[in-house]
Amino acid sequence: MKTGTILLSALLVAALQLQAASGAPGDEKAADSDYDVVVAGGTSYGVAAAVEAARAGKKVLVVAPRSALGEDLAGTLRLRPEDGASLPSWLRERLYAPNPDARPSLGVATPLQVKKALDGALSEAGVAFRCWLQPCDIAADADGLVTGLWVAGRDGRAFVKAKEVVDATLWASLARRTGNLVLDLPPDQEAKFARNVVSGERPSAPGLTATAVSDAAEVTTADAALSPQIAPAPGAPSNVSARVWRCEKSFPPGDLSARALARIEHEMRDATWTRDQADAADFVYLADPPAGIGRAHRIAKIVRRPPETPVLAETDVLVVGAGTSGAPAAIAAARGGAKVVCVEYAGRVGGISTEGGIGRYCFGLRRGFTSELDAGVSKVGSFYACCKAEWLRREGRRYGVDWWLCAQATGAVVENGRVVGAFVALPDGTYGAVRAKAVVDATGYALIAASAGARTEFLSDGELSVQGAGSLTRVLGRSHLNTDAFFVDDADPADVSYEWLRARASFGPWVWDQTSVVSSRERRRMRGAYCVTVQDVLSGRNYPDVVALAHSNFDTHGQTVDPQFSVHIPERKHLVSSRIPYRALLPEKTDGLLTVGLGMSAHRDAMPVLRMQADLQNSGYAAGLAAAQAVRKGVELRDIDVRELQGELVAKGIIDASDVSAAPSAPLSDAELSTTVASLDYDDAALARVFADASRALPILRRAYAAAREPERKLFYAHVLGALGDASGAETLAAAVDAAPWDDGWNYRGMGQFGASLSRVDSYLIALGCAANRGRPAVVEAIRRKAADLGPKSAYSHFRSVAKAAEGVGAGELAADLSRLLSLPGVRGHALAPSALPRIEGYAKDSTWIGAGNEERNVCLRELALARALYRLGDSSGLGDSSGLGERTLRTYVDDPRRVYAVHARSVLAGGHSARSRSGGGECLPGECAF
């Protein structure tokens, strides 16, 4: 795990630990560190200025708005040496060093090469830097002297103290807003803008000129064979002799405000589109920039103060996020007659399938809006990711959607307990409010819901269980690649920034670029008016307010925590269908808001079935129609006519009339429940009905256990009782654990994980770990004997089950056993120092990366499980120098740059020794959303 570790500047620690708040003005926090200089912007000239300041002995921080440095070069696809002619020679040499391994080679630098060169330049100079943070406003004292910089990220706004700010933004926006730069823009002279694209065909449009600025190389739709869905349109080429084109067009005189630039951006995208486009720049740029644009501006004093938190726009429906669910929501709301603004961080519409690199559907129902979308995209052109993004963008514009690209929402605008908009940072740093009559949170991590005060679920002091994520390569011509290599909290820009930096450092030189959307499968979720559980999914529950359908298997990408899954979990071939109720999109109390996508209200173990792209597109569309209806009728989102909405959804093909007419699922009668328990086995649907109605089922299960005569049957009932937290069968379970040797366990697996993440003995141990078993000697001894049989090479699931059982029983006498396990060779010491940047194993390969990151997560989860349990058992092992080992181990993770581990360790420590672990994240549990 230590192999290939890169040591970064210690200052990176402070940058990564920059704290922020909910996003509302007046609710911000300051960074922990002060800086001599803060460079606003991740441009190449910003990096040069930062290195120069560091060489002069100053403490420097660079704050970059995109997922990586280099928005002026990589973000605009200006990749020739002449594009960096004004840069210092030492930096030009790094940026444009020959790269014979690039595939395909266009004779220019690749965007990834630019980003990695800038990463390296700052790291070697000892400059701290953070991406995913938009510089907004320069703060000053009463005399105008600079005191720091306001930045905006996906977790709110933060303030960085500094004596000097260097404006290195694309448009010198901070210098212009504070009166430190006045551009000489003739009021009667047209401005010529440029946009670079990669295509075979020369872009052509009225008034547009296109010049080739690279060599040509063959780009092929190599992954089209994976699925007809991502194949080229009929008549579109599958092999393209592509090159970089610089496209220029003149526009009438105007300003360089963010909204003016956005209009030009969309017009340039219209003009530069070709059927065989393989990539395109995120930003336009001035072909002949006036003095002041494209260079750094040192600002120690401001001349004028910009207005504080202006209203940027007022609209009917605001959709935050233009990804898998958000883009369909925006289109649906606009089709429903609403005026729509859609705010999106990325440079393209479409989310994970266009900007995240996972283009091909896995499962899901390709019906409704998804069917329309697929049919439309199939006619567009050669390369699926580009074609899908363009179809969505154009379809939205056809109905009046105002797409705000490269803009970062930071939190909700709340008035009297109602969401009335969101705070947004525009690409030029302008920060203000977008007010709306209805808001759809399509961020995927419940940003607006969380900042509005809604309950959310993700990381906690419970067991650390997170579905795996990854950062993907962008390869010209390829629309689909999948990976699972680390854990990440999408809501935390520090965590995303660190893992993106790791991924870039790990990618091979053949890579064209890095994706800008996190390919994660589990994120912060809103706790809504209804929470969809595993039991709902497995029992096929009907809802009176069904608005979407889902279809998949339990592709868990790691371990599960639902108690039912400790008894039995469906295998890979077991596909299930589920309905999604409207209430799962509504907050418990907050009005004015719907939450869609991975942020909707559902148990983490139910999400693998609910999160398929095809289904999320349809549920997003349903949310957009609901928002439009609420605005049209002037009612709250929770008070819309659901039957009317369902009629629209049936007409669209998103749900069937039979879904609407089906009687809502009701609890089993006493007789039915007794019959179900009497014949209960490993049938998932039957188990689901029992686990969903646990309070009524438990007395029946106890009687069945007592009456059982066959040992296997008695053990089965004891197992189910234990999983439900009942100790009636504890002696039977303990005897079974004692009688069975350790079986084949499970080591952590992200990609390709289907079925159980526990062995049978593991599941018996976990069933023993309920509080009612405290003080039962047979239970304690069974756990102890199994712990004694573990060694350094034992499977992770065995360590996990022993730790969970010991922690659950709360037997302090097991502390010595846990301490011994934690002291085994190779078990401890897997936390990272704040300055470490280990390569991700397997990431340099040109493949699907099956297995990447598994071993790292395996050893960290094992160490944390043992340390957490030992700490909660009082952490007094009686082994002399091992006393306090659990706490000491947890504290090694407190400053780990992998924030998922750090947040978990801090939460456990904050709870103290006496805290009891929850199931794994504060999720809705069986029975909490029962019939």
Language-model-derived ranges and their functions:
Residues 59-64, 339-344:
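Short beta-strand "acidic-cap" motif of Rossmann-like dinucleotide-binding folds
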Residues 27-28, 72, 131, 136, ...:
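Flavin (FAD/FMN)-binding glycine-rich loop and adjacent Rossmann-like elements that form
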Residues 125-135, 397-410:
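A conserved beta-strand/loop element that lines the FAD pocket in flavoprotein oxidoreductases
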Residues 66-91, 347-370:
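Conserved N-terminal glycine-rich FAD pyrophosphate-binding loop of Rossmann-like flavoproteins
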Residues 682-695, 703-707, 712-727, 735, ...:
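Structural detector for internal amphipathic alpha-helices that build alpha-solenoid repeat scaffolds
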Residues 102-117, 378-391:
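Short beta-strand to alpha-helix junction loop
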Residues 32-43, 309-323:
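Beta1/beta-strand and adjacent pyrophosphate-binding region of the FAD-binding site
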Residues 666-677, 694-707, 726-750, 773-790, ...:
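Amphipathic alpha-helical scaffolding segments comprising HEAT/armadillo-like alpha-solenoid repeats
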